[in-house]
Amino acid sequence: MNKHMVLYLILVLLAVLGLGGMAIAGGIGQARVDIQVETLEGDVEQARELRLTLPFQADDHTLWETTFSPAGDPAPTTDFTYSILSMPPEREAFATFSGGRISDSIVASREIFQTVALLPDQLMTLARELAEDLEPGQSAGMEFQSEDYTTYFDFDLSLLMPKGDTYYVYTTPRNALKGYFHIPIPDGTRVSMSVTRSEDGGYFDVLVQPVGGSYGFNKNGCVTDGWIYLVLSPADFPEGTDFSQIRGGYGLYRIPTATDSYELDVGAMQTVLPLSYAEIEDICVMKSPWDGVLLLLTLEHGNLRLRLFDEASCTVLEDYTLDSYSSMPQVVQGENVLLLLSYDVPERSFLALVREDGQYVPSLRGTLPNKSYRWYEPAVAYRNGHLAFATLSPDEERPGLSMEVWIWEDGGEVFYGRFLRAAAWEDSIYASTPLRLSWKEDGA
């Protein structure tokens, strides 16, 4: 077979695959254009100028977005994209930050257990002493004061940078963050250790945990262009924890993402905004709608405080003291609005901060229905006194994707509806990017 015939057959095969794939994509997409609308409260006409966009993906080859108005006019429109090549969702760098634990667990073979320091030296010595006389299937344990064997909390930080279909992982050197934060475990904290030998005698299982409490955290760092921002919440540590020994003091920290190896440079870590840990009950940091500006939220004596932090100058641009909360609210960002969702009992409430003349202004307050689930991929939009809020949620009665939408104005809720798109919870179908919500532009 000559090379021209081989090339011809390859082109035919690609054409067949492409046409077949487009037919499959079209079939999948067309089956999901229909939107079922349920008006649960209020008047759907209040939502006529609202536009909702649902993005979905099937098997990394078919993408489609359906945009519709809750009122049904104009009719839903769907844009399709199909590719023979894989089109995985766009991914961003993210960081995981954990620590503050007085706990650890290991399972190791007898040889590894006796020769490798899988725990801090003093704890490893204690574990080996407990295991020394154990027969197969037996366990031994003890309690001790934390300061007798370990003095400072451990921390771990990992940065995952997207590279093609995978991620490159960068971590901090062992004990490097412990040396930076230098947070002592409170004296008098009781810790238990148990060691169990397997039935065949070949393995040891060690568990270290606090007595009468559970401490520690595992959360995301805030990754921007060149930096990872971190915070430490007193709510994640035992009562009485001392933060005064942190290098640079307690506050907002950042560490550069740039590195010549697979280790993050803890030596370049900075405390960029000093804060008083005695005033703070909880804290979180996130990106804002503007490049180079972060949102820093703190709970201080029961009141929520919002700061806008400028990365370039390391200064606070704006500072607001808001409502009272017993726990940190969920934050939903829109183009010109910041929505705070509270899960405090007995009811869920919201506060909308609208951007006016370069400032956030508390504009609307209300109560959301008590649901058994946390709001998933929420979106918010505001225009001329009307606040729209939407969230994806599993439908309890029918298969499909349920999306709930609320609209409020100064007088209260004016619309609450649910929208279903059939069969969207199939295994091969998933939301490729968050739900988008907007008001129709004037004259559009």
Regions found by a protein language model. Give the residues of each.
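Hydrophilic extracytoplasmic domains
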Residues: 307-444
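Short extracytoplasmic/periplasmic juxtamembrane "stem" segments immediately C-terminal to an N-terminal membrane anchor
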Residues: 35-52
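Extracytoplasmic/periplasmic/luminal assembly and interaction segments
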Residues: 57-106
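Residue position within the beta-strands of beta-propeller blades
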Residues: 125, 229-232, 296, 339-341, ...
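Hydrophobic membrane-insertion alpha-helices, especially the h-region
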Residues: 3-25
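Short coil/turn segments that connect the beta-strands within blades of beta-propeller domains
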Residues: 225-227, 290-293, 335-338, 384-385
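Long, acidic/polar, low-complexity amphipathic helices and coiled-coil-like
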Residues: 95-290
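Short, solvent-exposed loop/turn segments at conserved positions within beta-propeller repeat blades
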Residues: 239-250, 299-303, 344-348, 397-401
